[in-house]
Amino acid sequence: MAELEPISVIVTSVGTEQQAVEISEELVARGLATCINVIPCLRSIYRWKGKVCTDSEYLLMIKTRSALFDTVAEAIRDIHSYELPEVLEFPVARAEHHFHAWVAAMATGVPDPEGEHESEPELNYD
């Protein structure tokens, strides 16, 4: 079995569903993420500028190739409304082989604005 390129889950949180969708669609369209789960109804408690704050947020779980972390983080910072967005990388120690291959193949870092690659690349599951 061929060794696959490392993948990661990158996590960020946002204050609105609209921003969660905006960031998710942008990252996928730019080829920076294969799949993003948007998890609603988080409660975040944190210290900011000398005060304890509590907010409702949406969590984004971004699946991508590990090599794209810096580019994904920069894209999130460019789009995000927060002054200091959370951007954390969790390298995936193990994943089901076919899923791993799909994430690695689809997160190319290259946008597909014309939909030229409407079908997924041929994946070798051996």
Give the ranges of each region predicted by the language model.
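Positively charged, small/polar-rich N-terminal and surface patches that mediate targeting and assembly
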Residues: 1-126
